Amino acid sequence: MSQQTTDNRTTAERLFRSEEELAGMPASERIRYRLVTANKRYHANDNISAFVHEGELAELKAEVQAKLQDVLQALVIDTHSDHNTNETAKRVAKMYIEEVFRGRYVPMPAVTEFPNAERLNELMIVGPITIRSACSH
């Protein structure tokens, strides 16, 4: 099938996948497929945890690790004999999935509410509180 023929298929035809076909796809594509078919946004700052099935986070981490290994190879870094880069792709993938974008892949925590016994009508700040975020730029 030519690229133009593929591009001209309807959205429904491009989106329909059998369970068998889905099972053979990388975790990122399965998750993206669920988001697209549910017509849900998946921008950089969106929480997509509802579309990540059990076990897929580990698969996603392995997929990211493989891509990062490719990046290191493209940068002409000897990751096999340079002890400084041993398992770098694995560590960086873990950092992105479990730390930098943690709020993306795990459900948001419940918000705790307290009664306003003092009837305050101003913002109360307790700190200092350090906040770190990944900018989508």
Where are these regions (language model features)?
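Active-site loop/lid in soluble adenylation, ligation, and acyl-transfer enzymes
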Residues: 4-137
